[in-house]
């Protein structure tokens, strides 16, 4: 049962200015390490290849910082990204533009074009955000349907352990933002940090109650 989400983020293909669509050089296609990233990256590969464009498959390259570094350094030509991550890329979390999909798109498009010569293509009608998902048995037993109720549950000493990626645990616009907004704080013993950012893995950990986990980092599209 997902409880809430942070940031508005349209899905966009982020491309380097030198994207060689009409050249002999293959297009280096990347994606993030998670299942959704793999699906989207493979769609890009198939579309390009169906139009006779040679490609290099770098799908599931790594976490957000890894993929971001790859495209800014020229190791990638194109990958799917979310506009809300502009707040993270440009250390600008306090600007309310990131909570509006269109405003966030316009802002990150301008910043990346000016500073990095990266082009944000036309956004897809898709939205995805981080959420916290709690096992159904825990949610029903403790009447948890929102993060406000989760905060109340935690303050009452409720049993809780979250499986999440290191990125989600550490990024200012992720778990710390949830904690700040809803007035709770998770201790290290309430966190299971898993490699990568694949929500299929975090959700599986909650489903199987790995190491006592009963909640998971998830995506709004999960």
Region locations from a protein language model:
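A ligand-binding cleft/hinge motif common to bilobed small-molecule-binding domains
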Residues: 82-95, 104-110, 205-222
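Ligand-binding pocket segment of bilobal, Venus flytrap-like solute-binding proteins
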Residues: 156-222
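Short, polar/charged alpha-helical segment
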Residues: 35-54, 176-182
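Sec/Tat signal peptide C-region and signal peptidase I cleavage site
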Residues: 19-23
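Bacterial N-terminal signal peptides
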Residues: 9-18
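Bacterial N-terminal signal peptides that target proteins for export
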Residues: 1-10
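Extracytoplasmic "Venus flytrap"
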Residues: 26-44, 60-63, 167-170
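A conserved helix-loop-strand patch within extracytoplasmic ligand-binding domains
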Residues: 102-161
């Amino acid at each position: 049962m997902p409880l809430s989400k942070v940031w508005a983020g349209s899905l966009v293909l982020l491309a380097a200015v030198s994207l060689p669509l009409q050249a002999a050089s293959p297009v280096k296609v990347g994606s993030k390490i998670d299942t959704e990233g793999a699906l989207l990256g493979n769609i890009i590969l198939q579309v390009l290849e169906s139009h006779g464009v040679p490609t290099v498959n770098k799908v599931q390259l790594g976490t957000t910082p890894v993929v971001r570094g790859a495209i800014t350094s020229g190791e990638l030509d194109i990958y799917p990204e979310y506009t809300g991550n502009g707040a993270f890329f440009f250390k600008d979390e306090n600007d309310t533009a990131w909570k509006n999909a269109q405003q966030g798109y316009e802002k990150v498009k301008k910043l990346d074009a000016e500073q990095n010569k990266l082009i944000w293509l036309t956004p897809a009608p898709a939205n995805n955000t981080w959420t916290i998902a709690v096992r159904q048995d825990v949610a029903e037993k403790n009447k948890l349907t929102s993060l406000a109720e989760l905060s109340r549950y935690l303050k009452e000493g409720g049993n809780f352990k979250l499986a999440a990626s290191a990125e989600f645990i550490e990024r200012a616009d992720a778990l710390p933002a949830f904690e700040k907004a809803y007035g709770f704080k998770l201790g290290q013993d309430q966190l299971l940090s898993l490699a990568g950012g694949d929500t299929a893995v975090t959700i599986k950990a909650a489903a199987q109650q790995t190491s006592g986990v009963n909640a998971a980092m998830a995506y709004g599209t999960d």
